[in-house]
Amino acid sequence: MEARVAEAAARLARQENEIKSLTAEIEHLKNFGCLGISPSLEGLRDENAKLKYRLNFLQKSLQEEQSKTVKSMININSRLQEIFGAAIQAAYPELENPPLVVTPSQQPKFGDYQCNSAMGITQILLKTKEQKVSPREIAEKITKHIPANECIEKVEIAGPGFINVHLRKDFVSKQLSSLLVNGVQPPAIGKRKKVILDFSSPNIAKEMHVGHLRSTIIGESMCRLFEFAGYDVLRLNHLGDWGTQFGMLIAHLQDRFPDYLTVSPPIGDLQAFYKESKRRFDTEEEFKKRAYQCVVLLQSKDPDFIKAWELICDVSRKEFQKIYNCLDVTLTERGESFYQDMMKDIVKEFEDKGFVQVDDGRKIVFVPGFSVPLTIMKSDGGYTYDTSDLAALRHRLLEEKGDILIYVVDSGQSVHLQTVFAAGQMIGWYDPKVTRITHAAFGVVLGEDKKKFKTRSGDTVRLMDLLEEGLKRAMDKLKDKERDKVLTPEELKAAQMSVAFGCIKYADLSHNRLNDYVFSFDKMLDDRGNTAAYLLYAFTRIRAIARLANIDEGMLRKAAREEVIVLDHEKEWKLGKCILRFPEILQKILDDLLLHTLCDYLYELATTFTEFYDNCYCVEKDRQSGQIMKVNTWRLLLCEATATIMAKGFDILGIKPVERM
């Protein structure tokens, strides 16, 4: 290992020197260009652009080398892009930002990966140079310039100009051994950035319903992914804990529990309490007037009314926490009330910069590209959701100094959020080239009738009812399989919770979040197909293989350091490559925030493992006696590597596997 680190350090030093040299040359060219008298100025500008491209490429290589010294798992796709990027640059140095397309091959006959850049380069040469060159000829030229590397066994040119890449078996074997010795390491991300995720966000005094399920599950999983990748993550729960509805709630509290300041009111069912207060607000004029007075006193921070507000919030908070505990979700509460004192400054800042118009007493802000303005102050002087969302955005950017902001909110809020983001950019709070702000939108949950998921009476489904139903059905499923006869009561309880909550989460996460999805307990608890039930059962079977061979974790760790993982059988080779695709899967999700890609990968990994296990004996037994005759340790190591990746995948998805099911 020390020799490899020394070699990497030497390569880093050489690259740093070249980068310094190139930087100096670029500065020289800049200065020369500024004279404005050179007849070959255009040529110098072209050369400058090429040098910048080369500089960027070297800096990326430098980052890759640095990542290798800290044991991050190699992203094979990125490594191949680096290699082919160097080959294309060497073959066609005159091209600026040539296309770089490397993907896993879909069929074994096309190798392990494919580089399909030749077609794009053909078009560029025809368009910019008026050169007609066949993609195959370009592919041949690229392959001749592939630098010496540790991972490519051979390349072949197929069809019109596809470059089929075959990986070296010793390279794949070493990466698998490294995975087992060092554990699952995150992909290299360079500079550590701060990520702020806004998710879940229920309303105080209302119960969480099935509509909150998606935001909560998706947001939690995104947080886990960014945390694993090494980002500084702030998980925010933007609670609806302020507004006019608190006036009627406080007025009703005063009537029902007049001594609430000294005796904690026994509000058992906050939903019923809310409905009672709403009915009175709609039907009793005197109560309605008192409710408005309560709002004014609350907003003026009257201590008695703040106490009433806190009591109501606490009841809700405890109910929310029961659900968060079930789903293993962690959040930092920062509701609308947190931003109330910032509203005045938001209005003033937009006024000072000349963005505010007055319309029927309202203060509004038009944002270029959006037809509906933001209302930042109502005609009665009150603030709006627009004001509070702008205040939250400003605080996250300027006070929290977030580099990446992600709002996990339903698709129906898309136009509103995009308008708020654009307003923040317009006023100068952030530059989208520097700060990434994304609305991670999602569709609605449908019932099996393909309509919005409701109870038989037409009410919204309470989230706690849904989770309890999941627990009941999971236990029924386990008892149908007679697991209650082989598991201890503690193991059975753990399996029940793993299956129930794992299946509910996976059913959501395995669908593209942009689409609506049909909620079906029968489908999600099916142990066939791409479900959590199938993956959890597969995981327990994999973990049992070494245990049944009397091989413990210590023995496997020792074997990982000493034994070579043989990949001669086609199913061993297929499984080994599939395991090592994990870093590129994670990188893709960090880019597009589509978590179903991870679910698809885990299902592919489980089915690839099944193919391997059906064709390659890990433990060979005597057919008559059942006595173990031979243990193929390298295959047990492949089992362990598969389970290790699956466990990390489950962790990112928020699913808790069990050793026995």
Curated annotation (Swiss-Prot):
It is found in: Cytoplasm; Cytoplasm, Cytosol. SUPFAM superfamilies: Anticodon-binding domain of a subclass of class I aminoacyl-tRNA synthetases, Arginyl-tRNA synthetase (ArgRS), N-terminal 'additional' domain, Nucleotidylyl transferase. A motif ('HIGH' region) lies at residues 202-213. One of its GO terms (molecular function) is arginine-tRNA ligase activity. L-arginine binds at residues 201-203, 212, 385, 389, 413. Its EC number is 6.1.1.19. Residues 530-544 are annotated as: Interaction with tRNA. Keywords: Aminoacyl-tRNA synthetase, ATP-binding, Cytoplasm, Ligase, Nucleotide-binding, Protein biosynthesis. Its main location: cytoplasm. Residues 1-72 are annotated as: Could be involved in the assembly of the multisynthetase complex. One of its GO terms (cellular component) is aminoacyl-tRNA synthetase multienzyme complex. GO terms for biological process: arginyl-tRNA aminoacylation. InterPro entries: aa-tRNA-synth_I_CS, Arg-tRNA-ligase, Arg-tRNA-synth_N, Arg-tRNA-synth_N_sf, ArgRS_core, DALR_anticod-bd, Rossmann-like_a/b/a_fold, tRNAsynth_Ia_anticodon-bd. It catalyses: tRNA(Arg) + L-arginine + ATP = L-arginyl-tRNA(Arg) + AMP + diphosphate. The alpha-helical N-terminus (residues 1-72) mediates interaction with AIMP1 and thereby contributes to the assembly of the multisynthetase complex. HAMAP family: Arg_tRNA_synth. Forms part of a macromolecular complex that catalyzes the attachment of specific amino acids to cognate tRNAs during protein synthesis. Belongs to the class-I aminoacyl-tRNA synthetase family. Monomer; also part of a multisubunit complex that groups tRNA ligases for Arg, Asp, Glu, Gln, Ile, Leu, Lys, Met and Pro. This is Arginine--tRNA ligase, cytoplasmic. It comes from Gallus gallus.
